[in-house]
Amino acid sequence: MESISWNTPSVRDALAAVKRDAPFIYGLTNYVAANLSANVLLAVGAAPAIGAAADWPARFGAGANALWINTAALMSSGADTLLTAARAASKAGTRWVLDPVALGAGAPEYDAIVRDLLALRPTVIRGNASELIALAGGTAAGKGVDTTASPESALAFIGDLARRSGAVVSVSGPTDYVTDGVATLAVAGGDARLTRVTGAGCALGALIAALLAQRGAALAAASAAHAIYATAAERAADARGTASFAVRFVDELSLLDPAESSRDRSAGQIGAKRRE
């Protein structure tokens, strides 16, 4: 299995393209995650719009450079809003990310909406191990929005899900894995305090969308997003507490320079890590 990091040239090239092109990214998420998601996108040079005002789902779902749907948006928006955006994206050929938050945690009606979204063929599906095992048809109930399974236990499930759905699938944990059902890439590193920052996983989905907007291979885009995220978290590791870490993390995202010389701080050298 190949590993990638910030020192992988394609990762730096992907970030450089976002900074150059400032893609317009439309997102549907909940009020808990919206602020961090927008700030992550702004930090890397993308232009975000988040929310379901007026005709945004239909207009921006089709017109944005990429879309991401975090199903926690159902806290404040109806299922029709999410489905409208996904249908518009699919019809227009807009690439989009599905983040099935808390799938399998015990709400059948909610799970049914997620599966309706899956039928609209997202480009990338991003989640934690419990969510993705459940989406693939396995049994792994999470603890609310948090996982009770390891990424390694999800590998067979995410490979099967990728092959059946046609999407690239990425799972987060101490080591992240990204697969198209044929090739699987590993991204280690990050910082465990990302699990203590509300919306950190949701914001990763937003970052994946920003890199997808460049229209390169979806596997490369998604894995690059994971590597960029891990690197910023590592560089924020000397923050004193959780709140200062969250601020420093966004700072470090904004300071990542694709042209910098190689450092001995790549995603893959610090073993602690991260998120739901």
From Swiss-Prot:
Report the function annotation for this chain. Answer: Catalyzes the phosphorylation of the hydroxyl group of 4-methyl-5-beta-hydroxyethylthiazole (THZ).
Q: Which UniProt keywords apply?
A: ATP-binding, Kinase, Magnesium, Metal-binding, Nucleotide-binding, Thiamine biosynthesis, Transferase
> EC number(s) for this protein?
2.7.1.50
- Enumerate the residues binding substrate: 199
Full protein name:
Hydroxyethylthiazole kinase
Pathway, per UniProt?
A: Cofactor biosynthesis; thiamine diphosphate biosynthesis; 4-methyl-5-(2-phosphoethyl)-thiazole from 5-(2-hydroxyethyl)-4-methylthiazole: step 1/1
| Gene Ontology MF annotations | ATP binding; hydroxyethylthiazole kinase activity; magnesium ion binding
An example GO BP is:
thiamine biosynthetic process
Indicate the enzyme's highest-level EC class.
Answer: transferase
| Keyword field contains Kinase | yes
Its required cofactor(s), as named, are: Mg(2+)
